[in-house]
Regions:
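Hydrophobic alpha-helical segments within soluble ligand-binding/sensing domains
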Residues: 1-21, 68, 118, 134-151
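Short, solvent-exposed amphipathic alpha-helices that sit
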Residues: 3-7, 32-52, 66, 70, ...
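Short beta-strand elements in bilobed, periplasmic/extracellular small-molecule ligand-binding domains
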Residues: 21-24, 45-65
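Short beta-strand->loop
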Residues: 23-32
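Short beta-strand/turn micro-motifs composed of small residues
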Residues: 26, 111-113, 167
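Hydrophobic alpha-helical
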Residues: 41, 56-117
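Hinge/cleft segment of the Venus flytrap/periplasmic-binding protein
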Residues: 45, 134-176
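Glycine-rich, charge-decorated loop segments at or immediately adjacent to ligand/cofactor-binding or catalytic sites
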Residues: 116-126
Length: 176
């Protein structure tokens, strides 16, 4: 939920008190991480940014092609969209849809995970924010847990993982 709450705060700040309308894209509402992010996103908007409307969620099955088609349709046919929040994968399709349809009226676009695609899109202004859950740390934690299980040891401590928020201005120097 924290990642969704963070995304909502960023969208709310970008809207700066104006009337807004956000498109949410999710791989699947049945995926717990996606539904948790949406729950956190909705909670913050409802509490702190009631001026921002949420349109019906687009389900893309995390497929770039489906994302491109569904988001393009929404951007072409729904007036007044001011923000996009993608809770899942399929960012290649999201980037394609925005590039094909333009950013007219969009104040902010927030996605998850820093990849080559999202890095390029941040650099050229197609998207604005990538919230990175730092998958390399999650993977290392999972491996350490598996090793502890194999060695019949208690699980290692796992401090809370704070996501990194990337903008075009603070991208890491090393390539992805």
């Amino acid at each position: 939920e924290k990642a969704g709450r963070t995304a909502a705060r960023l969208v709310g700040m970008a809207e700066a008190g104006n009337i807004g309308r956000v498109i949410i894209a999710a791989g699947s509402l049945d995926a717990r991480d996606h539904s948790d992010r949406i729950k956190g996103f909705r909670a913050v908007l409802k509490r702190d940014f009631p001026n921002i409307e949420i349109t019906p969620v687009i389900e893309t099955m995390d497929q770039p092609r489906q994302m491109r088609e569904l988001l393009s349709e929404r951007l072409r046919n729904d007036d007044g969209n001011t923000a996009i929040y993608n809770v899942g994968a399929g960012n290649e399709g999201l980037v394609d849809a925005i590039r094909m349809n333009g950013r007219d009226g969009l104040s902010v676009c927030v996605v998850h995970e820093l990849s080559t695609c999202t890095r390029d899109a941040l650099e050229d202004g197609t998207i604005d924010v990538a919230i990175d859950q730092r998958p390399e740390i999650e993977l290392n934690r999972a491996l350490a847990l598996l090793q502890a299980i194999v060695d019949d040891l208690p699980p290692p401590p796992a401090p809370e993982l704070i996501p990194a928020i990337y903008l075009r201005d603070n991208l890491p120097n090393e390539p992805l």
